[in-house]
């Protein structure tokens, strides 16, 4: 059901932008952006490129990194190394970018709306280094655990305001919703053949505030 709703919204947005397109608009073919985002449990940064088929829609994608803000220190008898306490993921995100015409103009500044539905594709592998304290000191061991599978494809959709300060430059402020789980790979890990998932935060969807710098050429 969620997938059907997601695809329906994407199709409706696409149709609206097609109808809004006019032959008189100046066409820019390429859109590049740098985006930063923050949520309650992670920060994210990404670089994106979209080939604009019209001033209002285009296809492309982004590459980025997301890192958790909450430290995971381990469990009974084992202590996670400092450099492994916060989950971190690289990802690719194919997407459709939609720009609606400016709805407000203040001098030369135009303010409009944008939307960007897409996918978030991660590498289903992560490694945690830890000290095993189950043996008396000084017999502590340096060990590691790694993920085995787990979810790697997630839906996400961005929406917000375009603030055009020049025909080739704008800023955006928006919101991103994603089904991405920052601990997705860690939920498959085991310590002494026992899942560590009960020690991890409850799975939640991602809700972010985003800002970006955008160039058109």
What are these regions (language model features)?
Residues 1-27, 217:
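Cleavable N-terminal export/targeting peptides
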Residues 21-29, 55-56, 101-113, 165-171:
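Short loop/turn motifs that connect adjacent beta-strands in outer-membrane beta-barrel proteins
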Residues 24-45, 59-66:
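Transmembrane beta-strand segments that form the barrel wall of outer-membrane beta-barrel proteins
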Residues 31-35, 76-85, 141-147, 195-201:
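Extracellular loop and loop/strand-boundary signature of outer-membrane beta-barrel proteins
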Residues 37-41, 84-91, 145-154, 201-205:
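Short sequence motifs at beta-strands and strand-loop junctions characteristic
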Residues 51-138, 204-216:
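Gram-negative (and chloroplast) outer-membrane scaffold detector with strong preference
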Residues 157, 162-217:
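Predominantly the C-terminal beta-signal and adjacent terminal strand-loop region
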């Amino acid at each position: 059901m969620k997938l059907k709703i997601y695809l329906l919204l994407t199709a409706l947005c696409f149709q609206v932008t097609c109808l809004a397109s006019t032959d008189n608009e100046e066409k820019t073919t390429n859109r590049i952006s740098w985006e930063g985002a923050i949520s309650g449990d992670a920060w994210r940064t990404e670089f994106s490129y979209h080939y604009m088929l019209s001033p209002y829609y285009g296809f492309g994608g982004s590459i980025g990194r997301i890192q958790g803000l909450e430290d995971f220190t381990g469990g009974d008898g084992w202590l996670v190394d400092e450099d492994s306490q916060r989950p971190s993921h690289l990802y690719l995100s194919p997407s459709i970018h939609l720009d609606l015409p400016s709805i407000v103009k203040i001098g030369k500044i135009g303010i409009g709306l944008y939307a960007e539905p897409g996918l978030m594709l991660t590498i289903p592998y992560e490694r945690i280094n830890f000290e095993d304290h189950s043996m008396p000191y000084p017999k502590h061991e340096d060990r590691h655990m790694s993920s085995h599978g787990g979810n790697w494809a997630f839906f996400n959709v961005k929406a917000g305001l375009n603030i055009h300060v020049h025909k080739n430059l704008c800023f955006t402020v928006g919101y991103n919703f994603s089904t991405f789980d920052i601990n997705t790979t860690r939920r498959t890990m085991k310590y002494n053949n026992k899942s560590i998932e009960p020690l991890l935060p409850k799975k939640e969807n991602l809700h972010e505030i985003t800002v970006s710098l955008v160039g058109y050429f």
